[in-house]
């Protein structure tokens, strides 16, 4: 099938537009006669910058306006960072493809310190993620963790203005924007296990658009899809959102998936970990199995306590 025109809905931040243009380029290469446009949009998540995401409704704030454009036909597909996509999509929407994953890890960015472990007592680290906060507080209790919102450029400017001694950002975003030079170190899994889907792009469509599944199929990366499916199944089983300090990271080797999961308290006092392996075709079941291990260790009670504190 050779489409004549496709419209991509995207947030207007530099990173989101890079992602949309990346998919635009892939589609133009696949379908040279197709006109591929980008519809830039401002979302509620882009507008609310004075509160942490966990307190204003979560990362779904970054996708609702894009979904409305899909629903009313202004756009054919929307490009998202998968880690920003709620675990349960609204009825009538579907993820048609998940692209090959870039760097899934977090990056340490500082103008003063080369490594996280070099930071002295009371040094201020910025992050908007409860997932990162829980892990950093557990491993580095001497550091002060403070909220950090805004797009990548805004966050870097806050660091450069001296509001923070260091900040933690997704490595993939910095690399996509050619800001690799700002990265002092990539955090290990033991320092900061990634969020479900981190580093991967997802393509969302209105579920009834059966014509698009075949069109977008070449953009899907099988291994990444299996890994992200396992990660999202884990998070979904535990009610994961950005209001919960939850991490899930899956790797694949010779068709075998290894999934690592984590649930913590934002103050770092409790961090639960679990892992398991399964063939790639059982990705969803693997996610649920690791979620059960975490639940058996008290993850649901911990998540309930965190949500009660947040509310």
UniProtKB/Swiss-Prot annotation:
GO biological process, any: protoporphyrinogen IX biosynthetic process
Catalysis: reaction(s): 4 porphobilinogen + H2O = hydroxymethylbilane + 4 NH4(+)
Modified residues (S-(dipyrrolylmethanemethyl)cysteine): 242
UniProt keywords, alphabetically: Porphyrin biosynthesis, Transferase
GO molecular function: hydroxymethylbilane synthase activity
CC cofactor note: Binds 1 dipyrromethane group covalently.
Function summary: Tetrapolymerization of the monopyrrole PBG into the hydroxymethylbilane pre-uroporphyrinogen in several discrete steps.
GO CC list: cytoplasm
Essential cofactor(s): dipyrromethane
NCBIfam families in UniProt: hemC
Note: The porphobilinogen subunits are added to the dipyrromethane group.
Species of the source: Neisseria meningitidis serogroup A / serotype 4A (strain DSM 15465 / Z2491)
Family: Belongs to the HMBS family.
Biological pathway: Porphyrin-containing compound metabolism; protoporphyrin-IX biosynthesis; coproporphyrinogen-III from 5-aminolevulinate: step 2/4
UniProt cross-references to InterPro entries, sorted A to Z: HemC, Porphobilin_deaminase_cofac_BS, Porphobilin_deaminase_N, Porphobilinogen_deaminase_C, Porphobilinogen_deaminase_C_sf
Quaternary structure and partners: Monomer.
Protein name, per record: Porphobilinogen deaminase
Keyword flag Transferase: yes
Record CDD domains: PBP2_EcHMBS_like (cd13646)
EC number(s) on file: 2.5.1.61
Enzyme type, top EC level: transferase
Database matches in SUPFAM superfamilies: Periplasmic binding protein-like II (SSF53850), Porphobilinogen deaminase (hydroxymethylbilane synthase), C-terminal domain (SSF54782)
């Amino acid at each position: 099938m050779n489409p004549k025109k496709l419209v991509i809905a995207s947030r207007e931040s530099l990173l989101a537009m890079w992602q949309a243009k990346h998919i635009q380029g892939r589609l133009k290469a696949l379908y040279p006669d197709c006109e591929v446009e980008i519809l830039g949009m401002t979302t509620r998540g882009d507008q609310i910058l004075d509160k942490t995401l966990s307190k204003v409704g979560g990362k779904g704030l970054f996708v609702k306006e894009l979904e409305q454009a899909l629903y009313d036909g202004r756009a054919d597909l929307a490009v998202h960072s998968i880690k920003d996509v709620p675990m349960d999509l609204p009825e009538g929407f579907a993820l048609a493809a998940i692209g090959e994953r870039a760097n899934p890890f977090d990056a340490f960015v500082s103008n003063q310190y080369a490594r996280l472990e070099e930071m002295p007592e009371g040094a201020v680290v910025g992050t908007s993620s409860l997932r990162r906060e829980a892990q950093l507080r557990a491993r580095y209790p001497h550091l002060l963790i403070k909220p950090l919102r805004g797009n990548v450029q805004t966050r870097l400017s806050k660091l450069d203005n001296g509001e923070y001694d260091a900040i933690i950002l997704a490595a993939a975003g910095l690399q996509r924007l050619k800001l690799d030079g700002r990265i002092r170190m990539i955090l290990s899994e033991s320092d900061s296990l990634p969020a479900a889907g981190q580093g991967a792009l997802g393509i969302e469509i209105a579920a009834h658009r059966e014509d698009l599944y075949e069109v977008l199929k070449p953009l899907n990366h099988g291994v990444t899809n299996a890994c992200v499916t396992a990660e999202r199944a884990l998070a979904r089983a535990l009610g994961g959102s950005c209001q919960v300090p939850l991490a899930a990271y899956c790797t694949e080797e010779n068709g075998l998936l290894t999934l690592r999961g984590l649930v913590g308290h934002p103050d770092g006092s409790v961090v639960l970990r679990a892992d398991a392996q399964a063939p790639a075709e059982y990705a969803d079941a693997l996610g649920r199995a690791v979620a059960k291990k975490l639940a058996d260790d008290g993850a649901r009670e911990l998540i309930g306590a965190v949500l009660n504190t947040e509310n």
